[in-house]
């Protein structure tokens, strides 16, 4: 529960800096945790599934091997959706919530960072429990990256 709430707060912070709004859908039946919108551009919305991990064994030299539940995988893949969908994975320093932030009178740091990937072009699988998704470490989830994802949507 704490990882989920922290991950959602992280995405909210990125959205705020980027100038976008985000909201939890009233029903989560399609693996979308948050809808992110740009209020000043029509048709500029994406949906995101947010996961987190403190397991350093998932993190490789240039990517994260994240075991995504099969339902989430199937909901996020494919191009037959009106709103693009992305997986965001927040890497945490460890499982202890006290290690996730560093606060001083001058700053509040959320430690480590999140990465994004589109599963749009991923293939069907015979897996029944989960699918290991490769998330590039070059896809850092930043305000600039989010603006780019939203811009792609509104073209």
Model-identified regions with their sequence ranges:
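Mixed-charge (Asp/Glu-Lys/Arg
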Residues: 1-30, 36-155
């Amino acid at each position: 529960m704490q990882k989920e709430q922290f991950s959602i707060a992280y995405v909210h912070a990125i959205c705020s800096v980027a100038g976008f709004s985000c909201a939890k859908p009233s029903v989560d039946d399609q693996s979308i945790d948050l809808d992110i919108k740009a209020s000043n551009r029509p048709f500029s919305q994406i949906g995101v599934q947010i996961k987190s991990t403190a397991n350093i064994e998932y993190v490789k030299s240039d990517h994260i091997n994240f075991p995504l539940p099969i339902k989430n995988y199937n909901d996020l893949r494919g191009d037959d959706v009106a709103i693009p969908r992305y997986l965001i994975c927040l890497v945490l320093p460890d499982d202890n919530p006290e290690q996730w932030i560093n606060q001083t009178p001058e700053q509040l740091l959320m430690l480590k960072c999140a990465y994004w990937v589109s599963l749009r072009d991923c293939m069907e699988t015979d897996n029944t429990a989960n699918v290991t998704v490769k998330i590039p470490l070059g896809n850092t989830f930043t305000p600039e990256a989010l603006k780019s994802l939203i811009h792609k949507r509104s073209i």
